[in-house]
């Protein structure tokens, strides 16, 4: 009985080996490059994309290698709306950073939100733009979604907001800036 198992295993291995093609001199080898979608242990995917439009300080449109366009929301932050105080400033700050890298960024994401937007981290030349929006006083930490951040980002984001508040950076120069959630409640979309 053991002999049959061993013979079966050998036959299986032999069938796999027979299917392997070894290049020989003069054989033409074609290299096929396809975009690789990398997924980390915690379920986050990484993709290189181009930002095609900045909507506000926490939402952009992106286009991937295949030309597919999607709305992308910066995870863990809530920036002022465009018509809200500091809204235009927040969007312009994000746009200036993106101009410096010709709008080429990496997105690190795991899911979509209830509005169909991809939600994740925007990275330009290794710089976390979500974190930068907080550090420069152009966004709040969106505390409702801290659990969705990558490990380690929660503390960085919280400390960045504390520092921006303490040093009255950006919107924190205002003694009483209005949280975007409150502003949206007072100004519902039709």
Question: What positions do the PLM features span?
Answer:
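Small beta-barrel nucleic-acid-binding modules, primarily SNase/OB-fold domains
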Residues: 1-190
């Amino acid at each position: 009985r053991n002999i049959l198992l061993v013979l079966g295993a050998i036959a299986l291995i032999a069938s796999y080996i027979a299917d392997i093609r070894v290049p020989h001199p003069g054989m033409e080898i074609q290299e096929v490059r396809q975009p690789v979608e990398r997924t980390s242990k915690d379920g986050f995917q990484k993709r290189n994309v181009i930002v095609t439009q900045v909507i506000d300080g926490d939402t952009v449109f992106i286009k991937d290698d295949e030309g597919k366009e999607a709305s992308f929301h910066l995870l863990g932050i809530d920036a002022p709306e465009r018509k809200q105080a500091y809204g235009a400033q927040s969007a312009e700050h994000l746009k200036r950073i993106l101009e410096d890298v010709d709008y080429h960024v990496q997105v690190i994401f795991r899911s979509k939100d209830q509005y169909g937007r991809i939600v994740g981290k925007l990275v330009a030349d290794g710089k976390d733009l979500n974190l930068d929006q907080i550090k420069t006083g152009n966004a709040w930490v969106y505390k409702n979604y801290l659990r969705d951040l990558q490990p380690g980002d929660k503390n960085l984001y919280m400390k960045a907001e504390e520092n921006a508040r303490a040093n009255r950076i950006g919107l924190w120069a205002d003694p009483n800036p209005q949280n975007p959630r409150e502003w949206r409640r007072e100004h519902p979309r039709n």
